[in-house]
Design a protein with these regions (language model features):
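N-terminal membrane-targeting hydrophobic helices
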Residues: 1-217
């Protein structure tokens, strides 16, 4: 799952109107944001294996911290709790906590059986990445519904608010399409550096959301 995580962050704005889109993006993308850091540190590993699934050539054989259900549940509780302590905003704390752990459940839908329940534990996955039609349909549906919900719930204050969010989502969409049509990456380091670039979504989302407001507020 890639663009679907962004769609969920957009939709979560309805659950927590006072929480910045940047924070919601950080939550739903948390696993993929820390993953490249662990790759570069040699804590987790991935290998290029063309043909392992139809939609991605990557073999996610070792990511027990960033992508196990137990680890993400712990991070969900800690970060969601910290958010509440700093803001006293219950809805926002729930949105952050659920956003973090949601990553695992969305990835299970797409991945083959490589999503660990806990570090070293059983791995599961429905495997929609083995079907171009089903995989693309689920990604686009989740992404599109999220965009519609965010657009229906918020309105721009100015030109930045009118274009910045959609600029970010357009970038994300093109990155996803590029990953589908380009050849396999040469090595793990290139994968990690490319994944690190998605950190830009967090400040971009915060900036864009500052220029929008809740409809009817």
């Amino acid at each position: 799952m890639f663009i679907g995580h962004f769609g969920l962050a957009l939709a979560a704005k309805r659950l927590a109107p006072r929480t910045s889109l940047g924070t919601l993006l950080f939550a739903t993308e948390f696993a993929d944001l820390i993953w490249p850091i662990f790759l570069l540190l040699g804590i987790e590993h991935v290998r290029v294996a063309p043909g392992i699934t139809r939609m991605t050539p990557l073999d996610f054989y070792d990511y027990p911290i960033s992508h196990s259900l137990l680890a993400l549940a712990v991070c969900s509780a800690v970060i969601g709790g910290a958010y509440y302590l700093f803001t006293r905003y219950t809805a926002g704390a729930w949105a952050v906590a659920l956003g973090i752990v949601s990553h695992w459940f969305l990835d299970v839908v797409m991945h083959r059986a490589d999503m660990p329940l806990w570090p070293g534990g059983p791995r599961i996955g429905i495997g929609l990445w083995n079907s171009w039609t089903a995989g693309i349909a689920v990604e686009i549906l989740t992404f599109t519904v999220g965009i519609w919900m965010y657009r229906d719930f918020t309105r721009p204050k100015d030109a930045v608010g009118r274009y910045a969010v959609w600029g970010l989502m357009t970038l994300v969409l093109f990155v996803w399409i590029g990953s589908l049509v380009s050849g396999p990456p040469p090595n793990e380091k290139v994968i990690a550096c490319g994944a690190l670039s998605m950190w830009i979504a967090v400040p971009w989302g915060w900036w864009a959301d500052k220029h929008r407001e809740i409809r009817g507020a």
